């Protein structure tokens, strides 16, 4: 059996099968990071007036 041809076929099949899952995983990770960023932003909006103190009360 020709090892080079077999290796090329296995490599091609792996690229086809695993190439699509790579993009899906990265998309899920990006969505999770986006959600974390939104939560941090909202929490900082709530905490900032407390940290500023008197200036947040209308002065």
UniProtKB/Swiss-Prot annotation:
GO BP annotations, alphabetical order: antibacterial humoral response; defense response to Gram-negative bacterium; defense response to Gram-positive bacterium; innate immune response
Alphabetic keyword roster: Antibiotic, Antimicrobial, Immunity, Innate immunity, Secreted, Signal
Subcellular location field: Secreted
One Gene Ontology cellular component: extracellular space
Main location: secreted
Family, as annotated: Belongs to the cecropin family.
Protein's name according to its UniProt entry: Cecropin-A1
């Amino acid at each position: 059996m020709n090892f080079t041809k077999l290796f090329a076929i296995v490599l091609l099949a792996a690229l086809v099968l695993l190439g699509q899952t790579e993009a899906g995983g990265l998309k899920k990770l990006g969505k999770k990071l986006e959600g974390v960023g939104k939560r941090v932003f909202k929490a900082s909006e709530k905490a900032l007036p407390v940290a500023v103190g008197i200036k947040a009360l209308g002065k």
